């Protein structure tokens, strides 16, 4: 359901999907308490980065490789731009590995 009027688009990204879901539930709780419209959280595609590295440090011997992987999970939430709700959202304790981007749109 699209939100009418000014809205805030909140983009969450991080390495741990449980932490993202926990923060999303806190944002949903704040939206329910303040009575503002909420759309989401929408899970965006997970970005998977793989780095292949040779095991042998000198280049000699058989070619054996290690594959290191990092997955970046993303969520998107639209909320109507209410000053009281946004102040409470900005006071949420966020872990270090979770990034939050808030963009106000009209």
Curated annotation (Swiss-Prot):
PROSITE patterns attached to this UniProt entry: RIBOSOMAL_S10
SUPFAM superfamilies noted in UniProt: Ribosomal protein S10 (SSF54999)
Signal peptide coordinates: none
Membrane-traversing stretches: none
GO BP term (any one): translation
GO terms for MF: structural constituent of ribosome; tRNA binding
GO cellular component: small ribosomal subunit
NCBIfam families with a match to the protein in the record: uS10_euk_arch
Oligomeric and partner information: Part of the 30S ribosomal subunit.
Family: Belongs to the universal ribosomal protein uS10 family.
General function of this protein: Involved in the binding of tRNA to the ribosomes.
Name this polypeptide is given: Small ribosomal subunit protein uS10
Species, as recorded: Archaeoglobus fulgidus (strain ATCC 49558 / DSM 4304 / JCM 9628 / NBRC 100126 / VC-16)
Lineage: Archaea, Methanobacteriati, Methanobacteriota, Archaeoglobi, Archaeoglobales
